[in-house]
Design a protein with these regions (language model features):
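Alpha-helical transmembrane segments of multi-pass membrane transport and lipid-handling proteins
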Residues: 2-10, 97-122, 128-132, 172-176, ...
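Signature of the first transmembrane helix
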Residues: 2-7, 17-75, 98-114, 131, ...
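Helix-loop junctions and terminal segments of transmembrane helices
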Residues: 72-89, 151-152, 263, 267-311, ...
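Membrane-proximal transmembrane or re-entrant/amphipathic helices at the cytosolic face
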Residues: 1-12, 16, 416-417, 421-426, ...
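Interhelical loop/hinge segments that connect adjacent transmembrane helices in multipass membrane
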Residues: 2-18, 22, 157, 200-242, ...
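Transmembrane helical elements of multi-pass membrane transporters/channels
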Residues: 25-40, 166, 187-194, 198, ...
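Hydrophobic alpha-helical transmembrane segments
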Residues: 127-134, 162-208, 222, 226, ...
């Protein structure tokens, strides 16, 4: 049995410099994720003209339990494998068996619950969609372990290859099928195509096969002991994410729900690279230095400052520009999605800032604290959504943003109390971006609303005007940041240059996956 600690990985990372790995990882993972988002946007631009808001709403309602169920398919195994420091082969083999069994069981449960989903939403079509998508949990379960191993090795192939190709599979399949009149069923088949392609590519790239004889119940218990906190935390947040789906689908209908799905996606577009960095690069990086308190704290604070600069500016710019951008890009029928994107701008900014605290707590071995963060968000956000439900789609989206802001505030307090991060330094990291973003919104919002009115122009002219407004807004934002924190722009240019240098094929770092001795042996023998 392989009981060799993963010293090889840690030493390799230390030798090359963890900062370099993270910088290059952020560049590659962010680029891959941004490419995925660009392909997704292209697919949705076409699908917006082939599928009605009602059909998108039916698809969203039918999928309501899938994301939540996937947590129990995963059982926290992905985070546990990434965090694991020894006996990796044994852990990976155990996780491979556990996730497939869990995926099969969850798929059966979803199939049984499908009629109840139809009853809740008052639609036999939604019930049929729920039945059709029940098998997705089994498909996803098959790819959990290779995904975790790729992330663990700081291999960025998943972000740069797997996700863009899987998005392409969704787009091509969805466009072809919906163009031929399949409507919501075309979306279901496209989602399956994407997941199958993603799973096949993950297994092909990981170059690892499980040695099932190494799997053990004792190892499963060890993985679950870490993963249960991840499950609890993510269960709460997934429930919170489905509250607006349940409220809108039950009380306003499928069409507003379809508008919400589009609006939520649009609001997240400016932050694609941050998602890649926080969820895929920073967690394994932080986990490696969590025992070195001074280095750990300094790294977290620096990452928080840049996360805040990018997230707050990228999120709040949707307040003045979300509606005209959506109306012009997707057509007037999706105007309500633009209003949703405006209302969700604060949500996007607050959520991605607090996501860094989540990765910090997980790396510090305290994922249990994340559960409390998510409970705070679901209580505050849920209450706000219910209170603002009479305002319809926009009211629910404002409630979502309120919940995210409360979560971020609570996250800061927990990071101070649990990890020991100085509260004043965390607040300093976000103060300048908040002030600069508010000034940007204060200038752009009246400019667009009363002067430019880009959404009322012809498509090409309007999009050009939105682009010019966005450029002006970012210039205002950057200028105020530079005034408040001199040197910010110079540091940004340095980081971009470093990312570019390290992402070049002839750069000093290789993208070859770094394996533990046990995993390397498995590859050679398998």
């Amino acid at each position: 049995m392989d009981r060799t600690p993963d010293h090889g990985e840690g030493e390799a990372a230390a030798a090359e410099g963890l900062t370099g790995t993270v910088v290059r990882g952020t560049a590659l993972a962010g680029t891959g994720y941004a490419l995925s988002q660009a392909l997704t946007l292209a697919a949705y631009l076409v699908l917006a003209r082939l599928v009605t808001p009602t059909e998108f709403g039916q698809f969203t309602a039918g999928m309501v339990l899938v994301a939540l169920a996937d947590l129990y398919t995963d059982s926290g195994m992905m985070s546990a494998l990434v965090y694991r420091r020894d006996r990796v082969n044994e852990a990976a083999a155990t996780a491979a068996i556990a996730t497939v069994i869990g995926g099969f069981a969850v798929s059966l449960a979803l199939l049984a619950l499908a009629p109840l989903i139809g009853v809740f939403f008052g639609s036999t079509t939604i019930a049929g969609v729920a039945m059709a998508v029940s098998g997705m949990s089994l498909v996803r379960a098959s790819g959990v372990v290779p995904d975790a191993l790729l992330q663990r090795r700081f291999s960025f192939l998943r972000r740069t290859i797997v996700e863009p190709v899987s998005v392409l599979a969704f787009g091509i399949t969805g466009v072809v099928l919906t163009a031929n009149g399949l409507g919501v069923w075309g979306l279901v088949i496209a989602q399956y195509a994407s997941m199958v392609v993603k799973t096949i590519l993950s297994w092909g790239l990981v170059r690892w096969r499980p040695q099932l004889r190494l799997a053990s119940y004792a190892m499963w218990r060890e993985l679950i002991s870490y993963g249960r906190h991840t499950i609890a935390a993510t269960t709460v947040i997934r429930v919170g994410e489905e509250i607006p789906v349940l409220l809108l689908g039950r009380f306003t209908g499928a069409a507003p729900l379809g508008q919400f799905r589009y609006g939520r996606r649009i609001a997240a577009l400016p932050l694609a690279m941050l998602m890649a960095a926080a969820s895929y690069v920073l967690f394994p990086a932080f986990a490696r230095i969590a025992t070195e308190q001074e280095r750990f704290h300094a790294s977290v604070l620096r990452a928080l400052r840049w996360m805040a600069i990018l997230a707050i500016g990228g999120g709040l710019i949707m307040i003045p520009l979300g509606e005209p951008l959506t109306t012009l890009a997707f057509g007037p029928v999706w105007a309500d999605a633009g209003k949703a994107a405006m209302a969700l701008g604060v949500f996007a900014a607050a959520r991605w800032v607090s996501s860094l605290i989540v990765e910090t707590l997980k790396a510090d071995g305290r994922p249990d604290v994340v559960t409390r963060m998510n409970v705070v968000e679901i209580v505050a956000g849920g209450a706000a959504m219910v209170a603002l439900l009479p305002l319809g789609l926009v009211g629910v989206c404002i409630g979502v943003s309120i919940g995210a802001v409360v979560r971020a505030a609570y996250a800061f307090s927990r990071a101070h109390a649990v990890v020991g991060l100085p509260l004043t330094e965390m607040l300093d990291a976000i103060r300048a971006p908040v002030l600069a973003a508010l000034a940007m919104v204060a200038i752009l919002f009246p400019l667009e609303t009363f002067v430019v009115q880009a959404g009322d122009q012809a498509t090409a002219t309007g999009l050009l005007l939105v682009a010019l407004e966005a450029t002006l807004g970012l210039a205002i934002y950057a200028g105020i940041l530079h005034a408040l924190v001199p040197g910010t722009l110079a540091e940004f240019r340095y980081l971009v240059g470093r990312m570019w240098k390290r992402s070049r094929p002839d750069g000093e770092m290789s993208d070859r996956p770094r394996m533990s001795p046990g995993l390397s042996a498995t590859v050679r023998s398998g």
